[in-house]
């Protein structure tokens, strides 16, 4: 399991260096539902990754084209709305109450969301 996390992290790094849009999100681990773990003040919030992308894509009042023209403003909107992203959590680890969400580099994880969101918004798939 540890090797899977290392491979996922390495894949994310390579994907960000040589980003090629892919129809299937690489944050989907097999068929498991994937949650993003946010920390907002003292509470942790787990939001399904696909639901978050859908919400960001449909919430035109908050996420307008101008708001994500650059990475910093998009990242700030995510932080303001949901808090800081701490890692990702799979359905099985969430259900078994194992506190072993995959802690990833915050910058890489949020950059990944940014790319995936742009691909959905501009239909680059």
Curated annotation (Swiss-Prot):
Keywords: Chloroplast, Plastid. It comes from the Eukaryota. It is found in: Plastid, Chloroplast. This is Uncharacterized 15.1 kDa protein. GO terms for cellular component: chloroplast. Its main location: plastid.
């Amino acid at each position: 399991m540890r090797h899977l996390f290392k491979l996922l992290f390495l894949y994310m790094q390579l994907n960000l260096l040589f980003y090629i849009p892919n129809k299937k999100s690489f944050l989907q681990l097999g068929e498991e539902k994937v949650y993003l773990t946010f920390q907002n003040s003292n509470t942790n919030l787990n939001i399904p990754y696909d639901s978050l992308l859908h919400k960001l894509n449909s919430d035109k009042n908050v996420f307008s084209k101008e708001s994500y023209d650059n990475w910093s403003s998009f990242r700030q909107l995510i932080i303001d709305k949901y808090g800081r992203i701490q890692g990702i959590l799979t359905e099985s680890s969430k259900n078994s109450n194992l506190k072993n969400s995959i802690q990833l580099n915050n910058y890489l994880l949020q950059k990944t969301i940014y790319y995936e969101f742009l691909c959905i918004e501009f239909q680059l798939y």
